[in-house]
Every structure is written in structure tokens, then in C-alpha cells.
Amino acid sequence: MAVPKKRTSKSKTRIRKAIWKNKANKSALRAFSLAKSILTNRSKSFYYTINDKLLNSSKSISTSKLDES
């Protein structure tokens, strides 16, 4: 069975962990940006279907929020 010859240093471990976390953070930001563009109807590269029931309910919610202000 293959076993590493020497122990990995703390700094190398931290560097690898930071790279892994940065990749996860980047993909999360990309997904959040796509979600924001879809919600604000500014998406140009993402196609989706609109359900009439959801569309009508969202309009009533948005107008009720404006009335409360």
C-alpha cells in the first residue's frame, strides 16, 4: 500500500484548503449572480418557463409589499 514518505506541512495544507474554499466560494457567487439575474428578469443566457400560477401570486405579493410602505 502506498504511504507518503513525509508529513505534509501545515502551510501546504492551509494553502490547499484555501484553494478549495476559494473554488467553492467562486462557484457560489456565480450561482447567486445567476439567481439574481433571473429574479430581476435580466438573464440573457438562461431560458426557463414561467408558470402562470406563480406569476400571478408573485404580482399580488409585490403589490401588497408596496402598499405597506
Curated annotation (Swiss-Prot):
It is found in: Plastid, Chloroplast. One of its GO terms (molecular function) is structural constituent of ribosome. Pfam families: Ribosomal_L32p (PF01783). SUPFAM superfamilies: Zn-binding ribosomal proteins (SSF57829). Coiled coil: none annotated. GO terms for biological process: translation. GO terms for cellular component: chloroplast; large ribosomal subunit. Its main location: plastid. It comes from the Eukaryota. Keywords: Chloroplast, Plastid, Ribonucleoprotein, Ribosomal protein. HAMAP family: Ribosomal_bL32. Belongs to the bacterial ribosomal protein bL32 family. PANTHER family: 50S RIBOSOMAL PROTEIN L32, CHLOROPLASTIC, LARGE RIBOSOMAL SUBUNIT PROTEIN BL32C. This is Large ribosomal subunit protein bL32c. It comes from Marchantia polymorpha (Common liverwort). The gene is rpl32.
